[in-house]
């Protein structure tokens, strides 16, 4: 199993694309191996089916150039801190040995998103403990850093990543989720089918404007960032 440089976790397929699809495309262009892990099958989604979501997720991953997409089967609306979930997530981390991990920020209107971030953070810690036994019985692995992306929230980020050249890929990856973002005659009314992609574009535009770029994605970190570049640009 080839190790990943970046592994991004989401509660549901489309979470990662909403929060950091542009960043994924950017790092893939740089030669990084990037993976996505969907914790649930989104079986309680108002629109679409488990089968259609899987096909849409596959298409979105191809648009972004993702190396692998992992599907866990934790319960939708049941992402709580428990041994089984921790062992499954820690097993994924140990199997793919990423340098960086991303997960949803805890402040979000959907409880599953915040719970997913907490679960992944706890599992990442456990994955580094040699005596902790995960679901796949893999050796311990310690990640370098963990960062949090935003899904529904629009919070003050700790840092942003310029995605001006990758914004079209991000939007294309979201359009792959026709069942979620495109209103049809049979759609259940949700915030996602009422201009949600336009909201995402506006948010990334606002983050970009703060750093004189067309578009940027915002991230939260619990640790200080070490700046290697000269602040004076030398």
Model-derived features: where do they sit?
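Active-site rim/loop-helix segments in enzyme catalytic domains that contact anionic ligands
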Residues: 1-96, 220, 229-233
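Metal-dependent de-N-acetylase/amidase catalytic core
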Residues: 2-7, 83-234
């Amino acid at each position: 199993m080839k190790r990943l440089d970046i592994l991004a976790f989401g509660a549901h397929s489309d979470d990662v694309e909403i929060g950091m699809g542009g960043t994924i495309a950017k790092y893939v262009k740089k030669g990084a191996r990037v993976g996505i892990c969907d914790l649930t099958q989104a079986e309680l989604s108002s629109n679409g089916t488990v089968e259609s979501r899987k096909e849409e997720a596959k298409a979105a991953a191809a648009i972004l150039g993702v190396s692998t997409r992992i599907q866990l089967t934790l319960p939708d609306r049941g992402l709580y801190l428990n041994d089984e979930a921790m062992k499954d997530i820690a097993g994924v981390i140990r199997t793919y040995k990423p340098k960086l991990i991303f997960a949803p920020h805890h402040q979000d209107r959907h409880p599953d998103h915040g719970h997913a971030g907490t679960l992944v953070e706890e599992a990442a810690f456990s994955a580094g403990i040699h005596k902790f036994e995960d679901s796949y019985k893999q050796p311990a692995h310690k990640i370098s850093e963990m960062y949090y992306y935003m899904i529904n929230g629009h919070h003050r980020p700790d840092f942003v990543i310029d995605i001006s050249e990758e914004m079209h890929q991000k939007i294309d990856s979201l359009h792959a989720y026709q069942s979620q973002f495109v209103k049809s005659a049979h759609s259940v009314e949700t915030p996602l089918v009422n201009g949600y992609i336009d909201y995402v574009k506006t948010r990334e535009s606002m983050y970009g404007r703060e750093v004189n770029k067309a578009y940027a994605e915002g991230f939260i970190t619990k640790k200080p960032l070490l700046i290697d570049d000269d602040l004076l640009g030398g």
